[in-house]
Amino acid sequence: MSDNFYDVLGVSRDASEEEIKKAYRKQAAEHHPDVSDDDDAEERFKAIQKAKEVLTDEQKRQQYDQLGHDRFTEADKRGATGGGGPGGAGGPFGGAGGAGGAGGFEDIFNQFFGGGGGRGGGGGNRPRQGQDLRTGLTIDLEEAFEGATKEVTLTRPTQCDTCDGAGHPPDADVETCSQCNGRGQVQQVQQTPLGRVQQTSTCPRCEGSGELYSEDCADCGGDGVVREEATLSVEIPAGIRSGQSLRMEREGAPGENGGPNGDLLIEVDVDVGDRFERDGDDLRVNEAVSFPQAVFGDTIEVETVDGSVEMDVPTGTQSGETFRLKGKGMPRLRRRGRGDLYVKVGVVIPDSLNEEQREALEAFAEAGGEDVDVGGGFFKKLKSSF
């Protein structure tokens, strides 16, 4: 597999962001370690994630195209790529975000390739996608088995309707920022490992807009966003496991300068309950059988997630033996077939016997040539043998 990020996702160099995301979803679904049986599935999935991370970030993609794969990767290892996320959050490679712009190597790249962050670490007034948001959702085993439609409620940032995200009333007085002279960026000389360079960064006074307004929006306080409660309907695919996440596109934080919303990532927790244990797509369950059933063999009913099935208990079954019911486990996520159900048998030894049962077991012991103390030791011995 080629290391080139475009080749990893199978897209051309002029692919749009939507084409890249579509290719990522296809590759991720095919090569996720929980889905693929390939030995290198985990490493390949990491490469797919990395390729998507870089190529869907406008600034990182520009750096990648300018530097090439090898030089970009080396710069990445030194923490020299990427920028801060919206709202001042640090980028995935350690670049600082926030209204003051990024620092270090990111500023060098900005100087070389035309950077300068806008509000919240953006790039001038270019449209920027909003942050991805995360939340959790708990479902039961039956819902994970069948798939379900669930509702998730969260409080999230959304564009302020009062000012349409501008952060100020439409009739507010506006003046050109005197610190950057309306450019939204300021320049300064910084000492770096490459020597003294002139860097361009976001104007700290106007946060990259180049303008100052006489008053802020009363509802959002100038941020352009407010926090609201939202209830969303999410489709749960059959076979999902605890720890896996579902992505709802464009349900995240609002973008900047007309950019699209981020995505909402929903981490699923599957409550298996008390009866079953889950191991990937397989299930495990304990079933009790009587002493005569274990000795003579029998057919018993075993409850599965989707109903009961018959299972043969062979003659002479020992307590602790495990039997496999093929295809009676969980559905394989986005693949055909199901896992297996493993049934561990436990032989139940009676605590007390009536006279007829006692005589029968005494005869059983004598027929086997066992010299036992029927008054108490025999049954203790019998229990301990199971």
Curated annotation (Swiss-Prot):
Keyword field: Chaperone, Cytoplasm, DNA replication, Metal-binding, Repeat, Stress response, Zinc, Zinc-finger
Residues at which Zn(2+) 2 binds: 177, 180, 203, 206
Mapped CXXCXGXG motif repeat ranges: 160-167, 177-184, 203-210, 217-224
ZnF endpoints (CR-type): 147-229
Cofactor note: Binds 2 Zn(2+) ions per monomer.
A Pfam entry, by short name: DnaJ_C
Chief location: cytoplasm
Highest taxon, organism lineage: Archaea
Cellular component per GO, a single term: cytoplasm
UniProt region (Disordered), positions on chain: 22-132
Binding site for Zn(2+) 1: 160, 163, 217, 220
Biased composition (Basic and acidic residues): 22-35, 43-79
PROSITE patterns: DNAJ_2, ZF_CR
Annotated ranges, domain J: 4-68
Gene Ontology biological-process entries: chaperone cofactor-dependent protein refolding; DNA replication; protein refolding; response to heat
Location(s), subcellular: Cytoplasm
A GO molecular-function annotation: zinc ion binding
Residue spans of biased composition, Gly residues class: 80-104, 113-125
InterPro entries on file: DnaJ, DnaJ_C, DnaJ_domain, HSP40/DnaJ_pept-bd, HSP_DnaJ_Cys-rich_dom, HSP_DnaJ_Cys-rich_dom_sf, J_dom_sf
Disulphide bridges: none
Task of the protein: Participates actively in the response to hyperosmotic and heat shock by preventing the aggregation of stress-denatured proteins and by disaggregating proteins, also in an autonomous, DnaK-independent fashion. Unfolded proteins bind initially to DnaJ; upon interaction with the DnaJ-bound protein, DnaK hydrolyzes its bound ATP, resulting in the formation of a stable complex. GrpE releases ADP from DnaK; ATP binding to DnaK triggers the release of the substrate protein, thus completing the reaction cycle.
Family recorded in the similarity comment: Belongs to the DnaJ family.
Subunit structure: Homodimer.
Domain notes: The J domain is necessary and sufficient to stimulate DnaK ATPase activity. Zinc center 1 plays an important role in the autonomous, DnaK-independent chaperone activity of DnaJ. Zinc center 2 is essential for interaction with DnaK and for DnaJ activity.
Protein name: Chaperone protein DnaJ
Organism: Halorubrum lacusprofundi (strain ATCC 49239 / DSM 5036 / JCM 8891 / ACAM 34)
Gene: dnaJ
